[in-house]
Structure formats: structure tokens, C-alpha cells
């Protein structure tokens, strides 16, 4: 029944929707431990996708409830929303997840109003919360003081983080982890009587792994510390290795990985702790990595508008070959690209706008195995014309006039995705040394194989559609032809019927819409003959249809790949199990 309500009541209804979302978010997250202990890997993948979709589902539910219960005259009167915002601030002030509650309020407002009404008076364009809580440590950590005896501290850690499944071989792992720590750290650190180990109390879960995350520190220095744990079915829990290198820990929290499942009592304080471990990571990345991708989006937007306000940076077209479906531009001083869908595609492309959007959503929900760049979707970005180089703006207006619109001295971008900027692989190889070329092409092949084992076929595997990250990893970022591997029909090219067949410009055999012939990959992927030969040595099995068919068979049997986001001390073949 439609009724009148004071601002405080509307604020309470919005907050009630947030509480419902947070409760279900925690419920999904809390199940991660049991899924890890019971080796329920497919259930873990489903839970990850369910949690990603939960936010939009609950926003839609809350907006529908507000519309059903309140008169449009008061709900949709934008002049009332500064008062509603003030009432909401009072209601979230004592919460431990107040910054997430602000972002929720923004989502509800945008579900009710067009983006023309966005202002800091009606919603939280700028946060009212402190950016980092000024606490010396996270609210729930465990601290161990080895006093020169690392082994004793490790034994206590093994005891404190026990699971309901026993360790596979506790003594073996203790000896190995102790040896690895002594190997990774200077000898004086291990013997320092003031050395301390601080670990976050909650375990981080993702895919088939669990992670203890924290730091080693002395009064003068600190090192990040991560213990990856595995559960080998029928073998129990094992400590796989120990990581103390900041670059390697950064990769574990990479934008190319799925989001962690971790109990987070105070999100801002956990993020502040992680920020101290990984100072090179932006707050947006850290919030996103622990599942709060909408908060990551808010932090990204605030960083973007601050960058534009405080620098002379101007948008330019991104370097690389122009896309057939997407147009890509960037800010030189801001490590992000902005991708918009063109109005008209190259005739060789069979996709439409709706299909492209579906492909990006597929990537959002799927296990990215460290080989797909995460994206954020934005609507109705508004930037001053003065922030665009004239050539960039002219090109965007030409290729996407329905998406990029001039409104006086403002450029309206109706829809775009943001993505981490990388060096296109084809450009990287132009200036690479022989060793760098070999390493990049090897990682390019590994990227294709790991995506395939995760049931992803990139479709267009040209070098220009892959990027190289600052850590040297090869990542796929062009999604308009991406599909599930099991949807593809991998075939061998039939033998020619007559000698003339091989000379014909047209195939002598029928080709279905999902048919792929791996034998054709070498000439399509590599113009450079040296690169073609090298790749054949490194990953020649990618040219064999039987390799792809074998992967499809294992995927259909429900097997889930092990893809480790770190270098393992032992290097067994990746297992499908």
C-alpha cells in the first residue's frame, strides 16, 4: 500500500535492503570453508558467480520495494534526497561496514533516478567516512613471536588454523615451510629476537585454494607473508609453499583473479591492512579482490575524478591496433583503459551489441584463472570537453555517436567498461629481447591453455588481443568472441579430394558456425616466421584438434583445473582433478 513516510523511514528501508544483502553475502562467504574441506570445487565456482550476481539482485529488489510502498511524489522528489541522505548518515555512523552502506545508497539512488540528478548533495559522490581507519592493526589478527625459533611459531600457526580435515603430512609441511622461510629471508631476520608474524584471523578462499595472509615484521622492516594451502582429495590439507615477495603477493591479489571469499568483520580495516602489505595496489583493487566489487567501483570513480581535477591529463586513443568492435581510449597518467562499443562493426564480425554485453558478463562471473582482465561497467560518464585531445574526441564521436554525445562543453559517455591498461602483446614483442620473446610467447601459450582448461575459448587469439601486465604476465582482454570451450567443434582439415583443392581460395569442405581448425592457427596467429617456429616448439599441441577435444572431455566429466597464482617450489604438471 502506497503511504507517506518521513526521510528517516525511507533511509531505514534502504538500509534494511543493505542488511539483507550483507546477510546473504556473508552466508555465501561463510560456506567457503566447508566447500574447501569437502573439495566441492564446482560448488565453489557456482557460489562465486552467485555472490557476484547477488548485489544487483538485491538492489533491484530494494528499489522495487520502495516503489511499491511509497508514493512517487515523495520517493521521486529529488529535492528530498539531501534530507534522506542526512538521515541515512546518522543511521550508518556506528556500523563497521559504513563505506559499503554509502555505496549501497548510491546504487539505490541510481536505480530510481537518471544520472542527470547525481550530485554530492543527493548521494555519496565523495565519502563521508575516513579513507583509512587509523588503527595500528586489523581488528582480528594473530601475532606470533618466534624469538629466534621459527619452527616453534610455525607449529602454533598450524595448530591455530586447523581444519576439520586433517593435514596430509604435518611434519613434512612444517619442515618444508621452515626451510623455505630460511631460504627466502636473510639469515639475520630469521634470528632476530624482535621478529613477529602477524596473520589475518580469517582464511582467504578462492577456487581450489585457501590462503593465510599477513606479514613478517621487525621494528625496522616488514615483508608480506602468504601461506597457500591445498586440499588434495583423499590426501588431506597441505601447506603448499610460503610467499614473502611483494610482487608475487601482488599477483595473488591481481585484477585477473576471481574474488576471494573471506570473512570481513571491518572491511575498511582489512583493506587498510592489505594496503600496508601491498602499497602499490589501489584501494579499488583491494576492495574488489575481497568481493566488494561495487565498493571497488566507487573507489575507482573517486580516484578518477580526483585525477582529472588535479592533473592536466587528457584522454587519448589507446595504443595498439584499432578494434573491430570496441573503441579504446585512456588517460596517460591513469593506469586504465575505457572501452566503448562501436555503432557499426567490421563485416567480418557476427556479434551485435547485446552479445558483446553478454560476453563481458560471462567474464565477470567466470573463474578468470589469472588470464582474463576484470572490468567495471559504467553508465553516463560525464567529462569536460577540455579533458579530451581533439583527435581522440573526434574518433569517438565518429565510431560511436550513439554512445558518445556532446552536451555543450561536456562529453556524455552513455556506456563503457574500464579495464587495467596493459601493453598489447604484439607491441611488447616488437621491442622484446630474444629471452623476453621466448618468455612472453611461452606465457601466451600457457594463457590459452589455462583458459581452455577453465572452459574458456578466447575466439580471436591474435597477439593484439592479449596484453602484458607490469609483472610480465600475458592476459586476454578482447571478449567479443569469447565462448565456453565446450561450445566449440574442433576439427581436423579433411584431406583434399583433388590436387586443385589445395590451390583453391575457398575451402573444399563444409564449415559450421562453431567449427575451429587448430591446424590453421600458425598462419593466422604469427606473421613473424621466427615467432611461429618458436611457438610451435613451446606449445605445438595447441595446433592439434585432439588436444582441445581431450580438454573438452575432461571438462564434461566435471574436472576442475589447478591454476596456481604463484610460483610453486616444486613444479608438477598442472592437474585436472
From Swiss-Prot:
Q: Does the keyword DNA-binding apply?
A: no
Its Gene Ontology cellular component terms are: cytoplasm
Q: Name one GO molecular function term.
A: AMP binding
Give UniProt keywords alphabetically: ATP-binding, Cytoplasm, Glyoxylate bypass, Hydrolase, Kinase, Nucleotide-binding, Protein phosphatase, Serine/threonine-protein kinase, Transferase, Tricarboxylic acid cycle
Q: Entry's InterPro entries?
A: AceK_kinase (IPR046855), AceK_regulatory (IPR046854), Isocitrate_DH_AceK (IPR010452)
- Report the Pfam families cross-referenced here: AceK_kinase (PF06315), AceK_regulatory (PF20423)
Q: Its biological function?
A: Bifunctional enzyme which can phosphorylate or dephosphorylate isocitrate dehydrogenase (IDH) on a specific serine residue. This is a regulatory mechanism which enables bacteria to bypass the Krebs cycle via the glyoxylate shunt in response to the source of carbon. When bacteria are grown on glucose, IDH is fully active and unphosphorylated, but when grown on acetate or ethanol, the activity of IDH declines drastically concomitant with its phosphorylation.
The name this protein goes by in its record: Isocitrate dehydrogenase kinase/phosphatase
* Organism encoding this protein: Pseudomonas aeruginosa (strain ATCC 15692 / DSM 22644 / CIP 104116 / JCM 14847 / LMG 12228 / 1C / PRS 101 / PAO1)
As recorded in Swiss-Prot or TrEMBL, the protein's gene is named aceK
Amino acid at each position: 500500500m502506497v503511504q507517506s513516510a518521513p526521510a528517516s523511514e525511507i533511509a531505514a528501508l534502504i538500509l534494511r535492503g543493505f542488511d539483507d544483502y550483507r546477510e546473504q553475502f556473508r552466508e555465501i562467504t561463510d560456506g567457503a570453508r566447508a566447500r574447501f574441506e569437502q573439495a566441492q570445487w564446482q560448488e565453489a565456482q557456482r557460489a562465486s558467480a552467485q555472490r557476484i550476481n547477488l548485489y544487483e539482485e538485491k538492489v533491484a529488489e530494494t528499489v522495487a520495494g520502495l516503489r511499491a510502498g511509497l508514493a512517487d511524489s515523495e520517493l521521486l522528489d529529488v529535492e528530498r534526497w539531501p534530507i534522506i541522505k542526512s538521515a541515512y548518515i546518522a543511521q550508518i555512523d556506528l556500523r563497521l561496514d559504513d563505506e559499503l552502506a554509502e555505496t549501497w545508497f548510491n546504487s539505490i539512488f541510481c536505480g530510481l533516478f537518471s544520472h542527470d540528478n547525481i550530485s554530492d548533495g543527493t548521494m555519496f559522490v565523495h565519502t563521508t567516512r575516513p579513507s583509512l581507519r587509523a588503527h595500528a592493526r586489523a581488528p582480528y589478527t594473530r601475532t606470533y613471536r618466534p624469538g629466534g625459533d621459527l619452527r616453534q611459531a610455525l607449529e602454533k600457526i598450524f595448530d591455530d588454523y586447523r581444519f576439520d580435515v586433517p593435514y596430509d603430512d604435518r611434519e613434512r609441511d612444517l619442515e618444508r615451510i621452515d626451510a623455505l622461510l630460511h631460504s627466502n629471508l636473510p639469515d639475520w631476520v630469521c634470528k632476530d629476537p624482535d621478529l613477529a608474524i602477524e596473520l589475518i584471523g580469517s582464511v582467504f578462499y578462492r577456487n581450489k585454494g585457501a590462503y593465510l595472509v599477513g606479514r613478517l615484521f621487525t621494528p625496522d622492516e616488514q615483508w608480506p607473508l602468504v601461506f597457500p594451502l591445498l586440499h588434495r582429495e583423499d590426501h588431506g590439507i597441505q601447506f603448499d609453499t610460503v610467499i614473502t615477495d611483494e610482487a608475487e603477493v601482488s599477483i595473488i591479489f591481481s585484477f585477473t583473479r576471481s574474488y576471494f571469499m573471506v570473512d570481513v568483520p571491518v572491511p575498511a580495516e582489512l583493506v587498510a591492512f592489505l594496503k600496508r602489505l601491498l602499497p602499490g595496489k589501489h584501494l579499488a583493487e583491494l576492495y574488489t579482490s575481497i568481493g566488494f566489487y561495487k565498493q571497488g567501483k566507487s573507489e575507482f570513480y573517486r580516484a578518477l575524478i580526483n585525477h582529472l581535477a588535479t592533473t592536466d591529463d587528457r584522454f587519448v586513443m589507446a595504443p595498439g591496433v584499432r578494434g573491430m568492435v570496441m573503441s579504446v581510449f585512456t588517460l596517460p597518467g591513469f593506469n586504465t583503459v575505457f572501452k566503448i562499443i562501436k555503432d557499426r562493426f567490421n563485416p567480418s564480425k557476427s556479434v551485435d551489441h547485446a552479445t558483446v554485453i553478454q560476453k563481458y558478463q560471462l567474464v565477470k562471473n567466470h573463474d578468470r584463472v589469472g588470464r582474463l582482465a576484470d572490468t567495471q561497467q559504467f553508465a553516463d560518464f560525464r567529462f569536460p570537453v577540455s579533458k579530451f585531445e581533439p583527435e581522440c574526441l573526434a574518433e569517438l564521436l565518429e565510431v560511436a555517436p550513439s554512445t558518445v554525445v556532446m552536451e555543450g562543453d561536456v562529453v556524455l559517455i552513455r556506456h563503457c567498461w574500464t579495464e587495467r591498461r596493459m601493453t598489447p602483446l604484439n607491441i611488447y614483442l616488437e621491442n622484446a629481447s630474444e629471452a623476453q620473446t621466448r618468455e612472453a610467447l611461452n606465457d601466451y601459450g600457457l594463457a590459452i591453455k589455462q583458459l581452455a582448461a577453465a572452459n574458456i575459448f578466447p575466439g580471436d587469439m591474435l597477439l593484439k588481443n592479449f596484453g602484458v601486465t607490469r609483472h610480465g604476465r600475458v592476459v586476454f582482454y578482447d571478449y567479443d568472441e569469447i565462448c565456453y570451450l565446450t561450445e566449440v567443434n574442433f576439427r581436423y582439415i579433411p584431406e583434399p579430394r583433388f590436387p586443385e583443392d589445395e590451390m583453391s581460395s575457398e575451402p573444399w569442405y563444409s564449415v559450421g558456425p562453431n567449427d575451429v581448425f587448430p591446424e590453421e592457427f600458425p598462419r593466422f596467429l604469427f606473421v613473424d616466421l621466427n615467432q611461429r617456429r618458436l611457438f610451435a616448439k613451446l606449445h605445438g599441441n595447441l595446433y592439434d584438434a585432439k588436444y582441445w577435444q581431450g580438454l573438452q572431455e575432461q571438462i564434461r566429466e566435471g574436472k576442475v583445473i589447478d591454476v596456481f597464482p604463484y610460483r610453486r617450489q616444486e613444479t608438477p604438471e598442472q592437474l585436472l582433478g
